[in-house]
Amino acid sequence: LFPYTTLFRSKYCRFDAPEASGGYYTQDDIRELVNYARERHVTIIPEIEMPAHSEEVLTAYPELSCSGEPYKNADFCVGNEKTFTFLEDVLTEVMELFPSQYIHVGGDEAGKVAWKTCPKCQKRMQDEHLANVDELQSYLIHRVEVFLNAHGRKLLGWDEILQGGLAPNATVMSWRGEQGGID
């Protein structure tokens, strides 16, 4: 999700956390990369994976998962308001570091299995009149899109963001073939 140092690490994670592994880019490293790319007329589009591919985050912050336990599945709990606070904090910092008009949110390969039995996700589905877990994913993507648009950015995602209804201003990248981008 974020292999670079963040302004809010003290709020969410310590550098010496036992779950931490691997290297990271500092904010200065990111700025240097962005400037290097800009000098060559290249735009770096950051990708912050959601709702799936989030094992690292959910191991460090199990309260953002449906189980509330360290890594049981790879999807954020969409019924948990803390998930949105976390994602908005991450996206705010990403927007400060990357000037790209697009922010890629992934949106692919969400398992959605835990959402079917998660009380918070089921309540969100009931409160928002969502028929199924595909629409729950669409709810997350749409809500993130509204946040990004309010900050002058555009949402970019893989073709699975089409499932459950497309957010109005989203741009879709099809990785599963042409048909996914056409449908």
Language-model segments: residues:
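Substrate-binding cleft/loops of secretory-pathway carbohydrate-active enzymes
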Residues: 60-64, 113-114, 156-183
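Substrate-binding cleft of carbohydrate-active enzyme catalytic domains
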Residues: 1, 5-153
